[in-house]
Amino acid sequence: MWRLVPPKLGRLSRSLKLAALGSLLVLMVLHSPSLLASWQRNELTDRRFLQLNKCPACFGTSWCRRFLNGQVVFEAWGRLRLLDFLNVKNVYFAQYGEPREGGRRRVVLKRLGSQRELAQLDQSICKRATGRPRCDLLQAMPRTEFARLNGDVRLLTPEAVEGWSDLVHCPSQRLLDRLVRRYAETKDSGSFLLRNLKDSERMQLLLTLAFNPEPLVLQSFPSDEGWPFAKYLGACGRMVAVNYVGEELWSYFNAPWEKRVDLAWQLMEIAEQLTNNDFEFALYLLDVSFDNFAVGPRDGKVIIVDAENVLVADKRLIRQNKPENWDVWYESKFDDCDKEACLSFSKEILCARATVDHNYYAVCQNLLSRHATWRGTSGGLLHDPPSEIAKDGRLEALLDECANPKKRYGRFQAAKELREYLAQLSNNVR
């Protein structure tokens, strides 16, 4: 059974929203001339707005022609800079069109960090290069660790970047070769040799890897090859463009039962695909919430739209090196915390075991089971099942064992049976 926030909290929330709306209206009146100007101007053609002037301390330039030619345009409210203080994550919706195609399609633009995080990045670069918090980034970048691979360095190696981000917490050479070979911010992609990249491209690659590796996840495990991630389109300065998938998973929380069953089955299939695949890369989702998934409006397909916190472990290397307890199945510990979207895990263990149940645990605990809480609700995506399913009890038992197993290795078996049962339910309701 799912529950809403208590009435007092609900009223307080509504009061705060009304107060914020009132303040916003006052600000809009006071700034009406600049408001009109920002509405009429396409700021996505402005080099400084794109922060193209900060390259190579940026994420790439492959889409600059499209931005600067006016092919990318903010949607309605995205044009109002006055609203940026509400957009903490720096995520925008826009329309993109190719002149030859006619018509436009929706895209998502990301700065890959908040204003504060981006300012801290600049300060960090400057302090490392000059000892001062402000500097010319163009001059500073070649004096940082992001330039260490410039020149005649042949490969991107684990020793150079290990631990820089979740993606490379425990990188194998095979993974890093894949990142370089599929790097989309160069005209000469397709080779794993660093010498085929320009110095500026190498610095952009390393900066992206350290600051927010999401673009590299999308490029290395592309949707075109069946991976469940949004499609990467390109970057200009510090603005990255990805394909718009659809409404976030949260908007389906109260969808009809048959729809929620199908979405739940897809989520478990994603957990399986990222854990066990022919490439022998395990992609572990370290941040799992309703906001990090979206659903296609036409095909109803579930896609991961926030891939910043993905740890990739090379199972082939684990089996080859055989670290201590490498072949002992690892069971993630249930985390009954009082916050939303909690997960308990050890990155070191994820990197050192060949058989891990983390993705099943993350999906069951944070999305599907009665333990899932989000935006004041509880009960998970599969709340309030039909009476015959609730009476049978099998679904609830499988969800509980998947989230908080009572038997040793119980989650592995529960996840397998849950996938099969959801597939059966999904077929029955279609």
Swiss-Prot record:
Kindly state which keywords UniProt assigns to this record, in alphabetical order: Autism, Autism spectrum disorder, Cytoplasmic vesicle, Golgi apparatus, Secreted, Signal
Signal as a keyword? yes
| Pfam families listed in its UniProt record | PIP49_C
Subcellular compartments: Cytoplasmic vesicle, COPI-coated vesicle; Golgi apparatus; Secreted
Give GO cellular component annotations, separated by semicolons: COPI vesicle coat; extracellular space; Golgi membrane
Q: Look up the signal peptide feature and give its range.
A: 1-35
Q: Which InterPro entries match?
A: DIPK2A/B (IPR020519), FAM69_kinase_dom (IPR022049)
Could you tell me the Gene Ontology terms of the biological process aspect for this record? Answer: cardiac muscle cell proliferation; negative regulation of smooth muscle cell apoptotic process; positive regulation of protein kinase C activity; regulation of phosphatidylinositol 3-kinase/protein kinase B signal transduction
Q: Which disease is it linked to?
A: Genetic variations in C3orf58 may be associated with susceptibility to autism.
**Family of this protein:** Belongs to the DIPK family.
Q: What is this protein for, i.e. what is its function?
A: May play a role in cardiomyocyte proliferation through paracrine signaling and activation of the PPI3K-AKT-CDK7 signaling cascade.
Name under which the protein is recorded: Divergent protein kinase domain 2A
Q: Which organism is it from?
A: Homo sapiens
